[in-house]
């Protein structure tokens, strides 16, 4: 549950207080508010940068959805059946998305 104290929608910055069951109250000042469409576009850009590395090993990935910061990906080709796909997903793709796309909290594989 979040409560807006001050908003500046022209710059899409917001100062709000948020209560979560995980970490209690927290304050975020000047956080960028990104639409779901913008987040999907940024996620796709990062995936496009990573794609050559996946293709080199005979694999690929497809963006299925982004919902509340959770990126859902389908691993394709060799990546779909590779025993190392979890490592590729978590240590490679998820790490890159967490670093480069604000608001991403997790990456999940869908089948």
Swiss-Prot record:
Annotated signal peptide: none
Gene Ontology molecular-function annotations: iron ion binding; iron-sulfur cluster binding
Keywords: Nitrogen fixation
Gene3D superfamilies assigned: Fe-S cluster assembly (FSCA)
Transmembrane segments: none
One Gene Ontology term from the biological process aspect of the record: iron-sulfur cluster assembly
Record flagged with keyword Isomerase: no
SUPFAM superfamilies reported for this sequence: Fe-S cluster assembly (FSCA) domain-like
Role this protein plays: May be involved in the formation or repair of [Fe-S] clusters present in iron-sulfur proteins.
PANTHER family for the chain: IRON-SULFUR CLUSTER SCAFFOLD PROTEIN NFU-RELATED, NIFU-LIKE PROTEIN 3, CHLOROPLASTIC
Family to which the UniProt record says this protein belongs: Belongs to the NifU family.
Protein name: Putative nitrogen fixation protein YutI
Organism this protein belongs to: Bacillus subtilis (strain 168)
Lineage of origin: Bacteria, Bacillati, Bacillota, Bacilli, Bacillales
């Amino acid at each position: 549950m979040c409560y807006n104290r001050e908003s500046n929608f022209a710059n899409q910055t917001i100062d709000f207080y948020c209560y979560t069951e995980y970490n209690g109250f927290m304050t975020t000042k000047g956080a960028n508010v990104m639409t779901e469409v913008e987040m999907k576009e940024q996620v796709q850009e990062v995936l496009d940068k990573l794609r050559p590395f996946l293709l080199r090993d005979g694999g690929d990935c497809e963006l299925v959805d982004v919902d509340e910061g959770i990126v859902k990906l389908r691993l394709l080709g060799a990546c779909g059946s590779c025993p190392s796909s979890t490592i590729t997903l978590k240590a490679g793709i998820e790490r890159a998305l967490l670093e480069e796309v604000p608001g991403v909290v997790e990456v999940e594989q869908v089948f």
